[in-house]
Swiss-Prot record:
Subcellular location: Cytoplasm
A Pfam family: Adenylsucc_synt
Protein name per the record: Adenylosuccinate synthetase
Upper classification of the organism: Eukaryota, Fungi, Dikarya, Ascomycota, Pezizomycotina
Gene Ontology CC annotations of this record: cytoplasm
A GO MF label: GTP binding
Chain positions recorded as GTP binding sites: 11-17, 39-41, 299, 325-327, 407-409
Note on cofactor: Binds 1 Mg(2+) ion per subunit.
Subunit: Homodimer.
Matching HAMAP family: Adenylosucc_synth
Keywords assigned by UniProt, alphabetized: Cytoplasm, GTP-binding, Ligase, Magnesium, Metal-binding, Nucleotide-binding, Purine biosynthesis
Species this protein is from: Uncinocarpus reesii (strain UAMH 1704)
This protein's record includes keyword Manganese: no
Database matches in NCBIfam families: PRK01117.1, purA
Length: 420
């Protein structure tokens, strides 16, 4: 039985909490794509954990965790994150996490190149996290990357890294990068990594009758194929990416949970039709504490975009939704939701593939009354204010997928689970 948790918007929806809840009953928790550019925050027993490349199923003491073949792994960050978790009491974390030997290595060199590539874009910057994810996936696609399994073979990293560095030097000139230092670090990692590296299919076969939880990173609107290209990440962040990155049998998927924030946020550049560059956006940013887990950057904020959510649903085929951060809307007199786009005065029935076109759309809003009541920590549906219930039901009806969970605060316990 496989359960997927996927982001429905631009990321930062709060996927970590529902993953944390579901992982308590999971035997195996997996990351399928992306790298340490992702960021999940989980508050468990009053301890705050920040996850980037590691699956957040590590909080559950019985859960085995896999970083899958579709990911890119920055090895220093892997060990640093593991050390931080063990420092917060997860002493056996190193015994319950494995990396597919087919995952690719994200080098410090890639981070340097990431910054150089952004600089060449001038006013059309993508707004990457600067972690080297794009250049790493580029090297993978060009068949010149290094797989995690190859780190264990003496001399492979040195040969390939020298070749990569020479290629980038020809392109950019001198690099602010210490090639020899990185080569020497990987001589140490060859021994350190060995206990963590596995054949993914062998591990999955051992868990073929187990409860498997797939933790999506980033979100559908950042998908390399289906997102707001080119303002996207460099991996497949939707349903297709999870199947590809983990070699899943699609017939084993029992549920696909889409995580939707009760309003919209975005980090970095790119079109954002419902963005509020005004007091409303500022209020959402401050009240919601909208800062990136990975970069610390302020998130751009706006109203919930149901056009985008319907598009996301059509691609990811959600069977249930988790609406998060409802409590952030507690102090609004009225709340708007985007229900349609207009282009040149006419309502359009498609989601634009061209980012420049998406920048030009006129948003059609519906306005719903606020509830002006504190909802933080509410755990029962009947305890929600009537207008909050109506807001949730409106979203549910528009998207056409049941909202099974409603987040009402940062703690694990701040969640309503509705009977279906």
């Amino acid at each position: 039985m496989v359960t997927l948790v996927l982001g429905s918007q631009f990321g930062d929806e709060g996927k970590g909490k529902i993953t944390d809840l579901l992982s308590q009953n999971a035997d195996l928790c997996c990351r399928s794509a992306g790298g340490h550019n992702a960021g999940h925050t989980i508050i468990h027993d009053n301890v705050t954990y920040d996850f980037h490349i590691l699956p957040s199923g590590l909080i559950s003491p019985k859960c085995v965790n896999l970083i899958g073949s579709g990911t890119v792994v920055h090895v220093p960050s892997f060990f640093k994150e593991l050390e931080a978790l063990e420092g917060k009491g997860l002493k056996d974390a190193h015994k319950r996490v494995f990396i597919s030997d087919r995952a690719h290595v994200c080098f410090d060199l890639h981070s340097v190149v990431d910054g150089l590539e952004e600089a060449t874009l001038g006013g059309r910057k993508v707004g990457t996290t600067g972690k080297g994810i794009g250049p790493c996936y580029s090297d993978k696609a060009a068949r010149r990357g290094v797989r995690i399994g190859q780190v264990l073979d003496e001399g492979v990293v040195e040969t390939k890294l020298r070749s990569l560095e020479a290629g980038y030097r020809r392109r950019f000139g001198e690099l602010n990068y210490d090639l020899e230092a990185e080569i020497n670090r990987f001589k140490e990692y060859r021994t350190l990594l060995k206990p963590f590296v596995v054949d993914q299919l062998t591990l999955l076969r051992k868990h073929k009758d187990a409860s498997i939880l797939i933790e999506g990173a980033n979100a559908l609107m950042l998908d390399i194929d289906h997102g707001t290209y080119p303002y996207v990440t460099s991996s497949c962040t939707g349903l297709g990416g999870t199947i590809q990155g983990l070699c899943l049998n699609p017939t084993q998927i029992k549920s696909i949970i889409g995580v939707v924030k009760a309003y919209s946020t975005r980090v970095g550049s790119g079109p954002f039709p419902t963005e509020q560059i005004n007091e409303i956006g500022e209020k959402l940013q401050v009240t919601g504490r909208e800062f990136g887990v990975t970069t610390g950057r302020k998130r751009r904020c706006g109203w919930l975009d149901l056009v985008m959510c319907r598009y996301s649903t059509a691609i990811n085929h959600y069977t249930a939704l988790n609406l998060t951060k409802l409590d952030i809307l507690d102090e609004f007199d009225e709340i708007k939701v985007a229900v349609a786009y207009r282009l040149e005065g006419k309502e359009i029935e498609f989601f634009p593939s061209d980012a420049d076109v998406l920048e030009k759309v006129e948003v059609v809003y519906d306005t719903l009354p606020g509830w002006k009541t504190n909802t933080m920590g509410i755990t029962k549906w009947e305890d929600l204010p009537p207008n909050a219930q109506k807001y949730i039901e409106y979203i549910e009806k528009d998207i056409g997928v049941p909202i099974k969970w409603v987040g009402t605060g940062p703690a694990r316990s701040h969640m309503i689970e509705r009977a279906q």
